[in-house]
Amino acid sequence: MQLHPEPRPHPETQAHPETQAHLETRGTRVRPGTPSLLRELNDRAALDLLLGGEMLTRSQISEYTGVSKVTVSQMLTRLEERGLVMIAGEQAGNRGPNAALYSVVPSSAYVAGLYVESDMVSAAVADVTGRRVADVSVNPNGADDPVEIVRGTVERVCARAGVEVGRLSALVIGSPGVVDPRTGEPRLAVNLPAWHEGALDALRGAWRKPVVIENDVNLAAMAERAAGAAVGADDFVLVWLGGGLGLATILGGKLHRGTAGAAGEIGYLPVHGAPLHTDIRHPASGGFQALAGASAVRTLAAEHGLAAPTAAEAVQAALSSGSRGAGFLDELAHRVAVGVASVCAVLDPGLVVLGGDVGKAGGTALADRVAAGVASIFPARPRVVPTGVPGEPVLRGAMLAAVAQARAVLLASVADPQ
């Protein structure tokens, strides 16, 4: 018996190449082995297909995996007995009875994703299909202990979802700052001083469940690639323009983190027109952050007669303020282009996505200006576009990563009972 499943890409796992270890059996032929091993691999192949989100008939699963319909029936029976697969409908046939349509049981696994900021924590719960069942936003009210913040938020969103906390298979937390790729521990989060080395161990000890902390901009890039402006792109950068500045780099379909996890901390990038940093604990003291960060954008807006409480609102006001707003947008785009051109000189990406509150607010008006600015100071002409992710991209990326992890756990749990 041979197993030869047809590759069927999942947007969630495409967004996270580093989590794809669970796909090792896909697209390969099984080596000769015991019947128990073959049953296990076949069951995993069928479950993997159904985790893609489609409802499939027995004949379709047979076609995709290359095994007989009789074997597929046995596979599905075993998966049904384990509560992983169910009959979800029927497909009308040209002849004979309708064919049963199989799907994964959505409640076979649940996950949670969080986006932790200094003044707000957003969270959501989804089932293993990726369907979001509840979300909440919580003001931490000055609390800074990671375990306290996460516990309170997760308990609240699980209560809203009607899901027991103990049923969560994975938890992914997005936060600003540097995350050590070797340990997974946060190392430098200026706005979240309590999120330092040891936070991940504390969270795992408290939850006794898989927990991942990831840089917020990296998660946003995963969301862009799965369902935003970078769908299908294997090489692109996401430039985050918000309260802080950040960069996520996807090269060859993989996220580039750097040796210490600091790749993308472009707020520290030395640029012309801004002083050098004197203290890395204060990013706004110099570099690109001092030129194009939120504080600098608000100051620039005031100089153009555009008073607004936030940088994003200043950009929105500029879009409807005629020539006065155009002058502000031109100068802002020039500043952003200086940083983007520096990135392009090293990476030469074909696509640059402008994200964050400012990038989203600026839309194509800002993106087109940045593209023109980059072209005037750099020989290549990358395509520059605004974010295409609806809603909160960091939280969406966290949910995608969590679902991918839950699916990996589910696939790994499939073992022959005999």
Annotated model-derived regions:
Residues L114, V128, A170-G286, V403-Q418:
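Phosphate-binding/catalytic loop of phosphoryl-transfer enzymes
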Residues M1-E12, H16-E90, N94-R167, W207, ...:
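ATP-binding/phosphotransfer module of carbohydrate and carboxylate kinases, centering on a glycine-rich
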